[in-house]
Amino acid sequence: MEDFRIKYRKLGREKARGLYHEDGLIEIDPRLPAKEHLEVAIHEYLHHEFKHWEESHVEEYGRKISDFLWILGYRRVNLE
């Protein structure tokens, strides 16, 4: 697994929920609801791992994987 970093910042100006940068930086808007956060995190990580995939594949599999994990009960928990 190649190195990647996750940064949380508001992405309103970019009109995005998440962004992937070629240097391995994944940015996620911290205001996302839990299920949307899961989908966006997976979506951006898929861009990292499968750079050759078309956006339609990333969208499809990001949604499928996040739906599967949600059904299993995976949730984001803030421990702050």
Where are these regions (language model features)?
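Metalloprotease/metallohydrolase-associated module, dominated by Zn2+-dependent proteases
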Residues: 1-36, 50-80
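Active-site recognition of the HExxH zinc-binding catalytic motif
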Residues: 39-48
